[in-house]
Amino acid sequence: MVDAIQVAELRRFVEQLKLNPSILHDPSLVFFKEYLRSLGAQVPKIEKTERDYEDKAETKPSFSPKHDDDDDDIMESDVELDNSDVVEPDNEPPQPMGDPTAEVTDENRDDAQSEKSKAMEAISDGRFDEAIEHLTKAVMLNPTSAILYATRASVFLKVKKPNAAIRDANVALQFNSDSAKGYKSRGMAKAMLGQWEEAAADLHVASKLDYDEEIGTMLKKVEPNAKRIEEHRRKYQRLRKEKELQRAERERRKQQEAQEREAQAALNDGEVISIHSTSELEAKTKAAKKASRLLILYFTATWCGPCRYMSPLYSNLATQHSRVVFLKVDIDKANDVAASWNISSVPTFCFIRDGKEVDKVVGADKGSLEQKIAQHSSSK
């Protein structure tokens, strides 16, 4: 299942693209732009003015994460990165690739090797475009040779064409998943595009397969940037998690307050409520349970002498304990309620918590009644 937070971030990113399509031309998003093109999408070209280039030269690029508009006061800051060697992505048509289904003869392999030798000579003389031409002929002759694609990728790096290098490195790794040169070229290309985390991942694999000083030097440049981005991401993931917890707590309090208001309206805080039927008692019991209130059910009768003594006290206790629900049942007027509770004498005080009887006081025992109220009203 796709993470809901990631889906929300993607939706916001798409909305930003609708408002400003030029975001796609950020070097760090070249992989996404290539993917869109592979699906047949048309990426709008952005015409740069002379001032645009001046601004770019004057401004140090930085990693600018998207922030969640719903994250209250969380505003993500830019990550300070060393982008001194980041280049503009090359958006030329893909270079020629060989047909992997074509039959390769020994003669083809020999000719391809000859073209590679010419390319290496051209590289040593600094004639990189010529070297690319020779290597292109070589891959057409031997289209399943991983080393030929990886070598051409390394030359594309020398002429600052990271996207072309990535395409060749990908093909090289398709034919040889253990191609150190393929991982190295792709990692260096991604570093040129400012894709620091992906660059670090590829360079680490390359170093494990066949370490050299160039890989080590590149990792020293790439890893600090990748680490800063990862630390930044974790920081804001933690902050968002904290905000989620805060929102959940606010929502819980909001619901609790709503229940309190509902209970206050239904339970007449500070007053004694007379009950006349079992249905009325059930409604009040449910309301008290929903509001996590202690409920006291007082069974009385007009002919009961001790009840006449306890009733004023009961009303006074109701004003003192406004968060306790005080109910009163006249057993002669609501004998069905009294019968359902098996009341045999009055006054009787039943203590109810979460819909269940938890205690009882029988008789005009003022001290016991006050003690039980204090005990059970503070138990939750």
From Swiss-Prot:
Tell me the null mutant phenotype.
High sensitivity to heat shock.
Changing C307S does what? Loss of disulfide reductase activity
Organism encoding this protein: Arabidopsis thaliana
Q: Which residues form a coiled coil?
A: none
Q: Which UniProt keywords apply?
A: Acetylation, Chaperone, Disulfide bond, Electron transport, Redox-active center, Repeat, TPR repeat, Transport
What is this protein's gene name?
A: TDX
The stretches annotated as TPR repeats are 112-145, 147-179, 181-213
Q: Name it.
A: TPR repeat-containing thioredoxin TDX
Q: Which residues carry this modification: N-acetylvaline?
A: V2
Instruction: Indicate yes or no for the key word Endoplasmic reticulum.
Output: no
Kindly list the biological process annotations in GO that this record carries: chaperone cofactor-dependent protein refolding; heat acclimation; protein complex oligomerization; protein folding
**What residues form the catalytic site here?**
C304, C307
InterPro entries named in the record: Hip_N, Thioredoxin-like_sf, Thioredoxin_CS, Thioredoxin_domain, TPR-like_helical_dom_sf, TPR_rpt
Q: Which family does it belong to?
A: Belongs to the thioredoxin family.
Here the disulfide bonds are C304-C307
The keyword Acetylation belongs to this UniProt entry's keyword annotation: yes
Q: Where is this region: Disordered?
A: 49-115, 240-265
Q: Where is the Thioredoxin domain?
A: 252-378
Site entry (Contributes to redox potential value), positions: G305, P306
